[in-house]
A protein has these predicted regions:
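Conserved Nudix-box catalytic region and its N-terminal flanking loop in Nudix hydrolases
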Residues: 24-65
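A short, polar/proline- and glycine-enriched secondary-structure boundary/capping micro-motif
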Residues: 37-41, 101, 112-113
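Hydrophobic pocket-lining residues within nucleotide cofactor-binding pockets
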Residues: 49, 80, 94-96, 106, ...
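Nudix hydrolase/Nudix homology domain
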Residues: 103-149
Length: 149
């Protein structure tokens, strides 16, 4: 179960971005591979903050690595503590068409309305089936995403 926990002293720091597109959010269906976190789950685009890297640098790097895209602007919207993770959350708008993106990590890009995300099960067009959203991504959406549309 997803729980907020402010008691931990050391965290794994992660940057995550909510990419907004015409009233919807872009999400990534994670690969179905052993050894990765939350395989086969939908999540927002994110990455671990590396040594000597700021949360902003991390999200720029991750967006470039995962989508071959450089957003014109993004903004920091807050942080969320989820167990041992400290999530630095950003928001940006996709101004171009989704077809201009190239997914380099993950199985699929999905575009979902907030009401669909609320259901916690999102449809994959590639797999023709529903898959769960990661608990952390759902927590980030609950805290921040509902208020951005």
């Amino acid at each position: 179960m997803f729980m907020l926990d402010d008691s931990a002293n050391s965290f794994i720091e992660v940057s995550q971005v909510l990419i907004h597109f015409r009233g919807t959010y872009l999400m990534q269906l994670r690969d179905f591979k052993d050894g990765i976190e939350s395989p086969g789950h939908w999540g927002f685009f994110a990455g671990h903050i590396e040594a000597e890297e700021t949360p902003e640098q991390t999200i720029w790097r991750e967006i470039q690595e995962e989508l071959c895209w450089q957003p014109e602007n993004f903004r920091y919207i807050g942080e969320l503590i989820a167990g041992s993770r400290k999530m630095h959350v950003f928001h940006c708008e996709l101004e171009n068409e989704i077809e201009t993106l190239s997914l380099m990590e993950g199985e699929e890009i999905g575009v979902f309305l907030p009401q669909e995300i609320e259901e916690k099960q999102l449809y994959s067009k590639i797999r023709n089936s529903f898959f769960p959203i990661t608990e952390i991504s759902y927590g980030v959406f609950n805290k921040f995403g509902k208020y951005l549309t």
